[in-house]
Structures are given as structure tokens and as C-alpha cells.
Amino acid sequence: RDQTHEIVRTVSFAGDGSGRLPVPYGTEQTPPGEGAGQKIELPLRDAMVDRAFECWIHAGDIARAVDYPYDPPAPRHLHRMIDLAARMLPATLADRRRSGLAALSRDLVAAGAPGRSLRLEIEGEGGGEWFIALDSPGARASAEREVAHLALDGVEFCRLAAGHVSPAEAAAGRGGDREAVRDVLFAAASLSRL
């Protein structure tokens, strides 16, 4: 409710260029430690996509509970939801690493330099391909530094990001560095705690 209020408030005062304005989105609570209590902000455009994602997931939960058919969002909307989650993965990996929940960085590089990357292939409508920086959120993900590949269906990836499928249960094609694949699956699942 507070998130929705902040989104509407920001839009009503913003005017042109409002999609880039930051929207307060609560505080980091888990895992405890460094970073806990920090304010989370998302650009308005991303906050709207995140809110649409939450509404879709909750509506799907209700539909399943009453055995009512409920389709996923239109492909272009699903793509935006997947894109937001994929863009959040490098920072989430870094947070998990600082908390001891992910493997240590293997190859730190300067911000903007190409770093080790995982190719995330999302299949089905709304899918696409993203390269995820593994060792630093400031590194540039690239095909040349690909060390692992992870393929998931778009709806399955969203269910993983929503905490509705565990990383172990996610139906995924995997290749390359197993530790990197594992860390990305767990990072995706931890997005549900935002």
C-alpha cells in the first residue's frame, strides 16, 4: 500500500521525464547486516513494472485457489517484467555475496570493464537473452566473458523471482560454471524479498 501511494504521489507531481524519477520503495531488511535498513529506490518506470508484476502474481494465486483460468500478461508486458528482474540480478548477487550467501567474486574488474557473465536465456513469449555480470554489478556483462548459461521459460522465471518456485525446483537448462548458475538461481529467488 505504501509503495502504491509513493508511485501515485510521484506521478502526480512529476510532469515530463517522470519515468526516471526515483520512487521510495521501503528499506532493505533481509539479510541482516551491512546494507540492512538502507532505503530502496526504483525509477518510476521500474516501480510501475514491479507493481504490475506483483499484481499479476497475486491475481494468479487467487485464480489458482478458486480454480479459475488466468493467463500470463501480454508478451511485451511479460518481457518488461523479466527485463527488470534480470537488470536487478547483478546487484542482488553482490548483496548475497556480502552476506555470505553466494560464492566470492573470482575476477574483480574495474567498473565498466567486461567481467565474467552468465547468459540468461528466457524462452517463450516475452523472452529474450540477457548477460548477467557475475563478479561486480559495475562490470559490463558480455558474451565474450560468458562462463555459464541458464535457460528458463518466462513464466517459470517470474515464478522463481516471486518466490513461488524454489531454485532447486526451477525447470532450467544449465551449462558451464555450476556455481555461477546456482548463485543466479538463488539471487533470482531472493528478488521476492524486495
Question: Across the structure, where does each feature detected by a protein language model lie?
Answer:
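Short, helix-capping/interhelical loops that line the mouth of catalytic, cofactor-
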Residues: 1-6
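Long, well-ordered core segments of solenoidal/helical folds
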Residues: 8-12
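Structured surface interface patches that mediate subunit assembly and partner/cofactor docking
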Residues: 13-194
